[in-house]
Regions:
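Sequence-structural signature of mature extracellular/luminal beta-sheet repeat domains
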Residues: 1-145
Length: 145
């Protein structure tokens, strides 16, 4: 089977990542400019959907349609709220800071699975790696929210 490729827009002069489809549009991150972009396949328009994302790369949606991101600059997993704020879901494991989360997925139980490599490019140079592993982790929702 042959595939045809389409360039959506000119190169961004930085890394793009985290494409996720919401049923109407494609969202992706422009990591170095701290933005989430939205591509509308009907009009062909690409607009800035959110700014100030602190090196967020991987994106996903849960069963309720909420958007989550791996905020490598904040060393956390966050949820982007509809009012423009963010909620930190996880930023530590056993009291130690996450490394630099990269990609994530949610499952039907509402759990968030994510990769946790060390990528010093996306954080302040004074930061240090606290976890002694680069792994896949799972965050389980707790009764207290």
């Amino acid at each position: 089977m042959a595939w045809r490729f389409e360039l959506l827009n000119k190169p961004y002069g930085g890394i793009t990542e985290g494409p996720v489809w919401d049923g109407e549009a494609l969202y992706f991150t422009h990591i170095s400019n701290h933005r989430i972009m939205r591509y509308d396949p009907v009009s062909g328009a690409i607009i800035q959907a959110r700014e100030g994302t602190n090196h967020t790369n991987g994106l996903c949606h849960d069963a309720q349609g909420r958007t989550y991101g791996c905020c490598s600059g904040g060393r956390s997993i966050i949820r982007f709220e509809s009012d423009g704020t963010t909620t930190t879901i996880a930023d530590r494991v056993d009291g130690q800071k996450l490394n630099t989360p990269n990609d994530l997925a949610t499952d039907l139980k509402g759990r968030i699975w994510f990769t946790n490599p060390w990528n010093a490019v996306n954080i302040d140079p004074s930061e240090v790696e606290e976890l002694d592993n680069r792994s896949v982790l799972r965050a389980d929702p707790q009764p207290d929210g």
